[in-house]
Amino acid sequence: MNQTLGPILDPQVNAVIARLEETRRRPVGGGPRTDAAGNNAASNQDPYAWADYGFSIHPDQGNLIYLLCRAQRAARVAEFATSVGMSTLYAAAAVRDNGGGVVIGSELVPAKAFTAWRNLTEAGLAHLVDIRQGDARETMRDLGGPVDFMLVDGWPGAQGPSLARQVMEIVAPQIRVGGMVMNDNGEEDYLEFVRDPANGFRSMTLPIKGGTELSVKVN
């Protein structure tokens, strides 16, 4: 009898997800993530300062990614940013269970990209993934074909237009009609983009992890 609490049935994948979930550095009882010195991750705008601490989606978000990709029979998935590969595990498991395809991830920090590749290899999913190390505004300009599903969950960036908005403007033309986009951080200018009907999306906020934006491309 299957004892898993989520939609992924592969014990090898679930074991890696469980390990990553256990190692996320959070205070007992919740609260913001901190480093060994007690510094709040949200207060630091330098992604290299947190290379040893993988930022991960919530398991509910991961399960939703898997189910949406399965429902779409997604064969081409993109994500910004990969971090240590938690979201990539859910997406790649779905693509594999759909019959094959590719998950294209972008990660600025080499140490995180290496860790993600190691985690995906451990899960038996590395052959489905293309991790592009570098600035997503460059690495995601050509995703090789129509994108079925996109995750936008990158570093907030400095002042000015958010990286989420900048990356979305680059990727949006590559998303097929009917394709979906999930956003974790709810950057104001990103939300303005996906909620403007002129940009071809319909969007809503789901009550997951304090607000997860889910958008579908309609034209």
Model regions: which residues?
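Active-site residues of response regulator receiver
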Residues: D153
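A short alpha-helical cap/connector motif
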Residues: M1-F149, G157-M182, G186-N219
